[in-house]
């Protein structure tokens, strides 16, 4: 095999190898189903929560998107808002905020919890 054939063979091999190495897994990802399609095609007979797309009976039953790290504070108009659980090193307070019944009712001075949210809602902050 002469020198020119070897050069051509090496070049062809390099083209194939580079095509494999640099184009590997380059197929475009399939786009996620748009939010609007999920919302409109949910088949929910009750209320469809906008944040989580959970189907519930009433708006006040909607869960927070991240329940392990959020408190669901119910407002006087029966709407709700999800806030981050207060960061504290007090184990008793952490236990209260982790309790799904006690956490949303907690009102501790100096801590931005659901009690603080209600005061802010009533323009008392």
Curated annotation (Swiss-Prot):
Name the InterPro entries for this protein.
LCL2 (IPR034543)
Q: Which GO terms describe its biological process?
A: ERAD pathway
Q: Which residues form the signal peptide?
A: 1-19
What CDD domains is this protein classified in? LCL2-like
Keywords of the record, alphabetical order, are: Signal
Question: Which regions span the lipid bilayer?
Answer: none
Q: Does the keyword Signal apply?
A: yes
> PANTHER family under this entry?
LONG CHRONOLOGICAL LIFESPAN PROTEIN 2
To which protein family does this belong? Belongs to the LCL2 family.
* Function comment: Probable component of the endoplasmic reticulum-associated degradation (ERAD) pathway.
Protein name in the entry:
Long chronological lifespan protein 2
């Amino acid at each position: 095999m002469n020198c020119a054939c070897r050069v051509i063979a090496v070049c062809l091999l390099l083209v194939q190898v580079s095509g494999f190495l640099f184009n590997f897994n380059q197929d475009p990802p399939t786009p996620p189903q748009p939010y609007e399609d999920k919302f409109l095609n949910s088949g929910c007979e009750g209320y469809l929560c906008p944040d989580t797309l959970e189907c519930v009976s009433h708006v006040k039953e909607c869960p927070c998107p991240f329940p392990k790290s959020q408190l669901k504070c119910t407002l006087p108009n029966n709407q709700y808002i999800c806030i981050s659980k207060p960061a504290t090193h007090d184990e008793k307070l952490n236990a209260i905020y982790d309790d799904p019944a006690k956490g949303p009712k907690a009102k501790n001075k100096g801590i931005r919890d659901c009690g603080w949210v209600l005061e802010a809602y009533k323009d008392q902050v």
